[in-house]
Amino acid sequence: MPTTGNYFHLHLVSDSTGETLITVARAVAAQYANVTPVEHVYPLVRSQKQLDRVLDEIEEAPGIVLFTLLEKDLVSRLEAKCQQINIPSLSIIGPVMQLFEAYLGASTAGRVGAQHVLNAEYFARIDALNYTMLHDDGQMVDGLEDADVVLVGVSRTSKTPTSIYLANRGVRTANVPLVPGIPIPHQLEVLKKPLVVSLHATPERLIQVRQNRLLSMGAESGNENYVDKQSVTDEVAYARKLSAKFNWVMLDVTRRSIEETAAAILKLYSDRQRQRLPE
């Protein structure tokens, strides 16, 4: 295998920012823990002159070449050079575009960097992020009705990171903590538009996460109830009781990552939106 020591060169050539390439390449490279990729990222490659400089660098440090180029002349030149020096190359978007063309019966418009045009979707994400940051952890409850999704749950059920993840997908997300002995906001009780999702985890999992949190903060005494099994069990029961009372969707996050939790919520939200469409 053409590697040096325990690493290999990974060349990422893009006619745009290269973000798509980086995401895909790192996701795949992470599956090979015994070797480390040395990334060479070449964004905004849109001319023969720019590509020639890239090819010189690739030849100096041969390795895997991944690319997202739409200009056919550039693609042909890159592939020919890689074949000449006997290194693998692959278009990340080429097979996907071919599939689209075959199904839709239409060819691509060939717009370089089209995925990064500042459009309505981009501004929706910015709006969602602004809303989510302002409505984190029970803040500004008067604006809850303007949310797409409201997350509720006891401490350490990943409400905030999940909210931010959803906001990055353009979903306006608020979150409200559920604390025994503290009444929930009236605004939460009377919500009509938003999807309310109650995040749950087992007491054992919550205790583990909370203990790790205390250790990271250097906290010692004064937090007995926070990690006491009976107290945490009571919190979970309280949250479940409220969820049943207000008919909130309950989602167990005990064994879910943030991404998995967000994906489940996005599906719930999408299903709900479809149900509301006029027939």
From Swiss-Prot:
It comes from the Bacteria. Its EC number is 2.7.11.32, 2.7.4.27. Signal peptide: none annotated. ADP binds at G153, V154, S155, R156, T157, S158, K159, T160. GO terms for molecular function: ADP binding; ATP binding; phosphotransferase activity, phosphate group as acceptor; protein serine/threonine kinase activity. Disulfide bonds: none annotated. It catalyses: N(tele)-phospho-L-histidyl/L-threonyl-[pyruvate, phosphate dikinase] + ADP = N(tele)-phospho-L-histidyl/O-phospho-L-threonyl-[pyruvate, phosphate dikinase] + AMP + H(+); N(tele)-phospho-L-histidyl/O-phospho-L-threonyl-[pyruvate, phosphate dikinase] + phosphate + H(+) = N(tele)-phospho-L-histidyl/L-threonyl-[pyruvate, phosphate dikinase] + diphosphate. Keywords: Kinase, Nucleotide-binding, Serine/threonine-protein kinase, Transferase. Pfam families: Kinase-PPPase. InterPro entries: Kinase-pyrophosphorylase (IPR005177), PPDK_reg (IPR026565). Bifunctional serine/threonine kinase and phosphorylase involved in the regulation of the pyruvate, phosphate dikinase (PPDK) by catalyzing its phosphorylation/dephosphorylation. Belongs to the pyruvate, phosphate/water dikinase regulatory protein family. PDRP subfamily. HAMAP family: PDRP. This is Putative pyruvate, phosphate dikinase regulatory protein. It comes from Bradyrhizobium sp. (strain ORS 278).
